Amino acid sequence: MSETLTPRSLSRRRFVQSSGALLFAAQCPVGLSRKAYAGGTGAMMNSFVRIDPSNVITMLANNSEFGNGAYTVMSMMLAEELDVDYRSIALEAAPTTPEYYSPLFREYLTAGSVTTGSTFMPMRTAGAKARAMLLEAASKDWNVPAFELTTGDATVTH
């Protein structure tokens, strides 16, 4: 049995109306909970950065990626402070709990082309704090002052 499909016209207004539900659905990670999040291994440097014993850096992203470049720009901001290549950062959806809400919308939401602006300081701060923690840990381990240490290419050096 065959059926001939005929194209239908779809107005821009109708497209926007019908795609709204899809965009909303893209914002709501299904089944993500604190329990699922706790499955990661490694040290949580802060709310957004986890570094595993194998040196895998994972960023917990509190914005959705749906072709808007959110994950790329957030990785770049974090990598800039950590002195690593942004492409080496693994991504994981952050839990949908208040500490990960957008500072702009005060809920778990990605909208209005504001990811870069709303995550600039949180990502840069998270990266800078994680870097400072790494330098402090190396300083204690190597018994040298932290100000003598540098970072670059995902490495702490003295």
Predicted regions and their residues:
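Short, small/polar residue-rich loop motifs at catalytic or cofactor-binding pockets
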Residues: A43-M45
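Short, surface-exposed charged micro-motifs
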Residues: F48, E81, D141, F147-E148
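Short, surface-exposed loop/turn segments at secondary-structure boundaries that line and modulate
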Residues: E3, V56-M77, R87-A128, A132, ...
